[in-house]
Regions:
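Outer-membrane beta-barrel proteins
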Residues: 2-10, 16-212
Length: 212
């Protein structure tokens, strides 16, 4: 944990020093029938609009921001906001054939409800389509561990994932994504959530995305 935090603290300096290599900029926007995050709705079961921008270097360093409309009704501080805005930076690279590493730091912010803000340091591996990731919550925030698998299937790709949110919940996700009309994509996902207190939720979401 300390080694992971030490590395991500040094990431800004590493990114600046790597700017001499080629830099690319990308963006994305999406409309979803329900914004599901770790099995939990972030839009009160309704639609949400999201989008973001990323800057990456040939050497593997990246920095980006992502935002989404949100809607909460649980009586907590986040109920007072209708926006989530995340900022992240990291490093991604292939460490062997069909094996890749991604490590970074992300800040989740909710303008107007700063008590809900939290940070995570994360690390993930993709090994022949199997993924495993660990997000360490900072300053008392809960940790999250997930495993999954993705494979090309027909005109798109199939994915399945399971996650454990420390002292909070377990979630399961299965989905299919495919490209339509060049830069447009469609995704259909089934999610299932089990809270630590025994409550739960499940459903199907539809997402339309554009990433030029």
């Amino acid at each position: 944990m300390k080694n992971l935090q030490t590395f991500v603290i040094a990431l800004p300096l590493l990114i600046v020093s790597s700017m001499a290599s080629a830099v690319s900029v990308s963006g994305n926007i999406a409309l979803t029938s329900d914004y599901i995050w770790r099995g939990m709705t972030q839009s009160a079961g309704g639609p949400a609009v999201a989008g973001g921008f990323d800057l990456s270097t040939d050497s593997g360093f990246y920095i980006g921001t992502w935002g989404s409309s949100v809607q909460f009704s649980d009586g907590t501080a986040v109920e007072t906001t209708e926006l989530e805005l995340d900022v992240y930076l990291g490093y991604s690279t292939d460490i062997a054939d069909n094996i890749s590493l991604d490590v970074g730091y992300i800040t989740y912010t909710y303008p107007g409800a700063t008590d809900a803000n939290f940070d995570e340091a994360y690390i993930g591996f993709d090994i022949y389509g199997f993924g495993i990731s660990y997000a360490a919550g900072i300053d008392g925030a809960a940790d999250y561990v997930s495993v999954g698998y993705g494979i090309d299937a027909g005109p798109g790709s199939f994915s399945i994932a399971y996650g454990d949110y420390e002292n909070t919940s377990n979630d399961f996700l299965i989905g299919y994504d495919w490209g339509v009309g060049g830069d447009f994509g469609i995704g259909v996902y089934y999610y299932d959530l089990e809270m630590e207190d025994g409550a739960g939720d499940s459903g199907v979401t539809l997402t339309i995305s554009y990433a030029p």
